[in-house]
């Protein structure tokens, strides 16, 4: 299997048309980590362990006015043994285990795929910004030299690493500006350390000690009494020339709203199969659909010669919600026809469940306006290396030529958004969503950062809302356990918790989804106790902790205020910097960003900094009140 721009597999071979067909089943379980892998690929600066005929033999470290050269061989020894060369002893504090891990990272790729991918990127405005950043980190190089080095390296093998880039560099000496490298490191890891900082606060501040008792005769996490049947259809939208495969899960005794499941980018309708069967066993009809322009099949078909702009067409931001509305129209007709499925579809009361990009679909149908204009402003302001994988994905929508687009479908009565990609897709217009909404966030999500894609959107929602936080879970923890054997599940770049260790996440997903959906039925009061913080917390174990809230406490709102002030491009909030104290916090943190070492090594320092600042903020606010 060879479609790997960032993930790792134990098998490597040239990608051909026959290989695509042979690997499509394995690919069907992968997800948007192509973006995460791509960002990591760029940070690794290179390719191919095979040395070129005129490879760089020395690496010069520059820190301000200081310079120190070291043989590449000495750096190789350091990465193998961990022993710091004598000439690098003054820089030992920078050569942390995490730095060693990054420099040692080896990425398996297919040059046939990556070369046109990078060529397309480098010719774009984002690519020009990226090359400028890399040129600053490698003084004495030009953007053209960097592109040529990538090209040379790509023709020498199918493994990427930092040392590989050095071996492909045509001059004998390569200079590395440590300050610029640190900036790149901070940009690349920004969402990771933000998640690391916010997770302990979420776990602590959302914790409850006691709660109301839940009914002893009902367990929403266990299967219901209904036998589940499944039917597969392929619907044809002739107006838009789209074939939409759907799986329908149903039982003899049907009640409640219709449930529609929308998958994420590069996934398919099977990704939440366990959840669909569970809900159907309790008498709900569930329809899971494929979005033909952004599912795994579309990705496989465009894999050979893929350009960055082709991986996710901007039109998918329009087609996805229209796919669901088209589906509901067809199900209304099917609901009236005589047969096994007659009366099975309550299309006037629909709960849409989305995962990742599918959550965008769900929220758009619930009334959030797609705002390409606001999205363009964000994507133009953020440097390529600052983007999370989810940001790369959402910025594909910036190509749409509209100011705003509305896809609200009045039949949608609820939304469940697992690990949603939201960010700046809706600008400030997420407040237009008035239907009950459940957002599920994972603290170790390497794809969708907690703050900008879940916490900020949660605060914007104005209707009935719930936030479920899974500390220790990852982007794909909520998906079917069969996905743990996928390429992304085995990735060494985007860590995923998907096997048996993620079972508490899946059990809770079944319970909370059923309890939430039942709020639209006469059994609402019976299931209400299962929407309590205490019940959700009861699923916690040594590896995962779960929290539920309908409103963020003031302590977390203050923490987020600091974040918004120091990251104005992430999301617009009202003028919260009226207080001079908050302005001081902004300046203090901005300075701290410049002096702290890369995020994985400074989490504790940043946490202490934030705790101190927020304690002072609380005291000063008390004085003002």
What are these regions (language model features)?
Residues 204-254:
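N-terminal cap/lid segment of alpha/beta-hydrolase-fold proteins
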Residues 354-358, 362:
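Gly/Ala-rich beta-loop-alpha elbow adjacent to hydrolase catalytic centers
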Residues 266, 270-273, 278, 290-319:
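Cap/lid segment of the alpha/beta-hydrolase catalytic domain
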Residues 433, 439-441:
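Short beta-strand/loop motif that positions the catalytic acidic residue
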Residues 435, 449-458:
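Short alpha-helix in the alpha/beta-hydrolase fold that links the catalytic acid
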Residues 309-343, 382:
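Alpha/beta-hydrolase active-site loop
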Residues 66-71, 75-212:
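Mature extracellular/secreted ectodomains of secretory-pathway proteins
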Residues 255-264:
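Short beta-strand element of the alpha/beta-hydrolase
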């Amino acid at each position: 299997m060879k479609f790997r721009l960032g993930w790792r597999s134990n098998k490597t071979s040239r990608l051909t048309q026959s290989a695509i067909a042979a690997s499509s089943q394995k690919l069907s379980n992968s997800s948007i980590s192509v973006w995460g892998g791509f960002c990591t690929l760029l940070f690794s600066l290179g390719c191919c362990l095979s040395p070129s005929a005129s490879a760089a033999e020395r690496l010069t470290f520059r820190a301000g006015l200081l310079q120190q050269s070291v043989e590449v061989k000495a750096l190789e020894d350091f990465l193998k043994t961990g022993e710091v060369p004598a000439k690098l002893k003054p820089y030992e504090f920078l050569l942390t285990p995490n730095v060693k891990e990054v420099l040692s990272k080896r990425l398996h790729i297919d040059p046939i795929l990556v070369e046109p991918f990078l060529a397309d990127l480098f010719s774009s405005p984002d690519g020009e910004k990226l090359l400028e950043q890399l040129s600053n980190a490698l003084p004495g190089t030009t953007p053209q030299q960097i592109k040529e080095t990538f090209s040379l390296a790509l023709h020498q093998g199918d493994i990427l690493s930092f040392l590989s880039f050095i071996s492909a560099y045509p001059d004998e000496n390569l200079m590395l500006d440590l300050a610029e490298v640190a900036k790149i490191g901070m940009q690349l890891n920004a969402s990771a350390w933000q998640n690391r900082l916010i997770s302990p606060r979420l776990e602590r501040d959302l914790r409850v000690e006691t709660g109301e008792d839940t009914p002893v005769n009902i367990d929403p996490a266990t299967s219901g009494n209904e036998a589940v049947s499944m039917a597969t259809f392929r619907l044809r939208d002739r107006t838009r020339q789209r074939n939409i495969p759907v799986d329908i899960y149903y039982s003899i005794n049907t009640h409640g709203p219709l449930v529609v499941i929308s998958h994420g980018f590069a996934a398919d309708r099977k990704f939440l199969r366990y959840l669909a069967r569970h809900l159907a066993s309790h008498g709900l009809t569930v329809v899971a659909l494929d979005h033909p322009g952004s599912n795994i099949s579309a990705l496989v078909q465009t894999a050979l010669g893929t350009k960055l702009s082709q991986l996710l067409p901007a039109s998918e931001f329009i087609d996805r919600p229209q796919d669901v509305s088209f589906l509901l129209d067809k199900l209304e007709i099917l609901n009236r026809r005589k047969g096994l499925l007659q009366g099975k579809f309550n299309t006037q009361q629909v709960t849409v469940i989305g995962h990742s990009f599918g959550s965008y679909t769900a929220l758009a149908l619930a009334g959030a306006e797609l705002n390409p204009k606001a999205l363009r402003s964000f994507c133009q302001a953020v440097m390529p290396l600052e983007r999370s994988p989810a940001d790369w994905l959402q910025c594909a929508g910036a190509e749409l030529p509209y100011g705003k687009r509305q896809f609200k479908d009045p039949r949608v009565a609820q939304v469940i958004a697992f690990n949603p990609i939201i960010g700046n897709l809706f600008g400030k217009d997420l407040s237009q969503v008035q239907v009950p909404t459940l957002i599920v966030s994972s603290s170790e999500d390497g794809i969708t950062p907690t703050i900008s894609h879940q916490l900020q959107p949660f605060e914007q929602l104005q209707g009935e809302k719930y936030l479920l936080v899974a500390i220790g879970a990852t982007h794909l923890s909520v998906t079917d356990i069969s996905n743990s054997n996928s390429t992304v599940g085995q990735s060494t770049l985007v860590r995923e918790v998907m096997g048996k260790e993620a079972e508490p996440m899946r059990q809770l997903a079944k319970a909370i989804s059923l309890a939430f959906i039942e709020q639209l039925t006469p059994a609402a009061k019976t299931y209400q106790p299962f929407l309590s913080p205490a019940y959700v917390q009861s699923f916690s174990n040594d590896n995962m902790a779960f929290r539920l809230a309908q409103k963020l406490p003031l302590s977390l709102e203050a923490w987020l205020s600091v974040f918004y002030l120091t990251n104005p491009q992430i999301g617009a909030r009202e003028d919260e910097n009226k207080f001079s104290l908050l302005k001081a916090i902004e300046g203090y943190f901005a300075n701290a960003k410049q002096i702290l070492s890369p995020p994985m090594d400074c989490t504790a320092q940043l946490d202490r900094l934030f705790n101190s600042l927020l304690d002072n903020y609380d005291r000063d606010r008390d004085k003002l009140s």
